[in-house]
């Protein structure tokens, strides 16, 4: 069924739940625009038998969307208050196959691999560790580069190594700790 996006939005922002804007979540994090969420899901196309790792839970809305499509979702959120709120919203929507963990993906170790990885914050460059968590024939959606012109890509894990498929240009706030080091200027 269709998930009410407003159920994942702060009360005072509910009238903006479907507007084409990024909604603030606190900690400098935002809920991505609905159009970007749609393109992300379209490019990943999680299947009913697949496992998904989401990096950056935020509101929990994308985790819920992924959970409706896939077999199971593990979602990482570095901020404890966001993680707790997201888990509560997922429970309220009766979505039982999504687990939110409070962890920093840049240092966390899953001890397993996944069919699909969805990274909801941008990175300066693609972390090798994320790619290593993909199952053979798995795929990862990630946005990388320098704001305001970043590239959304799918990283495909194949027997012959990894292939990067460019999807579209976009701009997205960085994953906590994953912004590029500022260029040194005099």
PLM region spans:
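Conserved nucleotide-cofactor-binding alpha/beta core module
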Residues: 45-163
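Positively charged
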Residues: 180-186
């Amino acid at each position: 069924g269709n998930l009410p996006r407003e159920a994942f939005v702060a009360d005072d922002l509910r009238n903006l739940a479907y507007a084409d804007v990024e909604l603030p979540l606190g900690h400098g994090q935002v809920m991505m625009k609905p159009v970007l969420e749609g393109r992300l899901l379209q490019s990943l196309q999680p299947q009913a038998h697949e496992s998904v790792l989401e990096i950056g839970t935020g509101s929990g809305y994308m985790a819920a969307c992924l959970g409706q499509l896939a077999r199971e979702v593990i979602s990482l959120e570095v901020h404890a208050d966001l993680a707790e709120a997201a888990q509560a919203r997922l429970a309220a929507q009766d979505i039982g196959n999504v687990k939110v963990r409070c962890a920093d993906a840049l240092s966390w170790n899953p001890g397993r691999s996944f069919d699909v990885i969805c990274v909801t914050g941008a990175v300066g460059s693609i972390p090798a560790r994320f790619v290593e968590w993909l199952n053979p024939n798995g795929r990862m959606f990630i946005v990388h580069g320098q704001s305001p012109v970043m590239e959304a890509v799918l990283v495909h894990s194949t027997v012959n190594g990894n292939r990067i498929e460019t999807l579209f240009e976009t701009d997205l706030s960085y994953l906590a700790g994953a912004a590029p080091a500022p260029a040194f200027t005099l």
